[in-house]
């Protein structure tokens, strides 16, 4: 199993596990800061609940619809609540996704979702 190129992958497919073991795959943006991949999400969605119950994940490079472009790699996810870590990782998203990230952040702030975001850190095994 090869590790996906998180620095250059526009999207990754994040596979999380339900309590019954079923896999749920979700295409997401990812940015790397200090060797850790970061994802942001709404706080009460399924992937966050599944990570809270089981931090084991798999990731693979994919297109925006989740079509695989690379091989799966095993990893561990954790929910980030440390504000200093959150503040430190956001510039990586801004560099990687540029204007689209700035627009996404502006709209999220406009509707009150920016501060509610749940940040997820993924490290490869």
Predicted regions and their residues:
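Short, structured patches in soluble enzyme cores that scaffold and shape functional sites
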Residues: 16, 123-124
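Protein maturation boundaries and topogenic segments
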Residues: 1-10
